[in-house]
Amino acid sequence: MSLFDWFANRRKSHPVTKAQPEREISDGLWSKCESCGALTYTKDLRANQMVCLECGHHLRVTSDERIAQLIDAETWVAMDNNLVACDPLQFRDRKAYCDRIQEYQSKTGLQDAVQTGVGELDGLPLALGVMDFRFMGGSMGSVVGEKLTRLIEHATQNRLPLVIVCASGGARMQEGMLSLMQMAKTSAALDQHRTNRLLYIPVLTHPTTGGVTASFAMLGDMILAEPKATIGFAGRRVVEQTLREKLPDDFQTAEYLLSHGFVDAIVPRPELKRTLAQLIRIHAQMPMASDVSPAAVPVAAAVE
């Protein structure tokens, strides 16, 4: 038997098995940084609030994770969890809007793209809204606008500081004009909150764009942003095509907006809770924060 025949027979009797594929990174044990590609033990990454230990890149977090990062344990009381979007326009693109809503509700466990409620931050009571980009890109429709408006009105009546963590692609196109009117509705509610000289701090995370940027995201007394967050109204390519000129590489980043006076501070996520607590305490010591009686603003929300 030739050597060639021996190898051929051996291959038949001992077939070569395919190498086992590498273990998926998404199994939960390790996480890969979207910026530098570093592999980090997920437990360590979560301990650092989903900020890369190598390059400082801020990975996206869910609204539940954000609430846990900011609110003291066992103090969170959610509001208006029963609100669900309807489909007045009977909108359909590749699938019906109502089917798309149900799909995202199943994927995220949320009713819509924002969670609202009250709780304590470092022992300080406040009203908090947290947008979740996982739910249709954090787009603002009727439910998001209504929940935020009720939250703002609740904060006004109860003289609470207000924090809204923004993460959105803008207005929800599937609701047409009904989504656009939420910009005016939330802005009007914030004007009442401001008239009562109460503190409102929006926190702009990646990304904050479109109708959210053009409304409540930019109406704060102090506007904070996470490092390297994309913040703007229209997309970069749209702006370049409209202006017909090349934009700076850092255009529409938190750092660019800070240098041009559109945000007041860039705060790394691990320092956010401490920074918010400091700002709330400073505002509480100001005479104007306690000398004004609450305005008679109707409050539609009831804490569940």
Curated annotation (Swiss-Prot):
List the InterPro entries.
AcCoA_carboxyl_beta (IPR034733), Acetyl_CoA_COase_Trfase_b_su (IPR000438), ClpP/crotonase-like_dom_sf (IPR029045), COA_CT_N (IPR011762), Znf-ACC (IPR041010)
Q: Which UniProt keywords apply?
A: ATP-binding, Cytoplasm, Fatty acid biosynthesis, Fatty acid metabolism, Lipid biosynthesis, Lipid metabolism, Metal-binding, Nucleotide-binding, Transferase, Zinc, Zinc-finger
Q: Where does Zn(2+) bind?
A: 33, 36, 52, 55
This protein's cofactor list reads: Zn(2+)
What does the entry's cofactor note say about binding and number? Binds 1 zinc ion per subunit.
Q: In which pathway does it act?
A: Lipid metabolism; malonyl-CoA biosynthesis; malonyl-CoA from acetyl-CoA: step 1/1
Subcellular compartments? Cytoplasm
Q: Name one Pfam family in it.
A: Zn_ribbon_ACC
- Supply one GO molecular-function term: carboxyl- or carbamoyltransferase activity
Tell me where in this chain the CoA carboxyltransferase N-terminal domain is found: 29-298
What are the residue ranges of zinc fingers typed C4-type? 33-55
Top EC class for this record? transferase
Q: Which GO terms describe its cellular component?
A: acetyl-CoA carboxylase complex
Q: Spell out the reaction equation it catalyses.
A: N(6)-carboxybiotinyl-L-lysyl-[protein] + acetyl-CoA = N(6)-biotinyl-L-lysyl-[protein] + malonyl-CoA
Q: Name one GO biological process term.
A: malonyl-CoA biosynthetic process
* Described purpose of this protein according to its UniProt entry: Component of the acetyl coenzyme A carboxylase (ACC) complex. Biotin carboxylase (BC) catalyzes the carboxylation of biotin on its carrier protein (BCCP) and then the CO(2) group is transferred by the transcarboxylase to acetyl-CoA to form malonyl-CoA.
HAMAP family in alphabetical order: AcetylCoA_CT_beta
Q: What is this protein called?
A: Acetyl-coenzyme A carboxylase carboxyl transferase subunit beta
State which gene encodes it.
Answer: accD
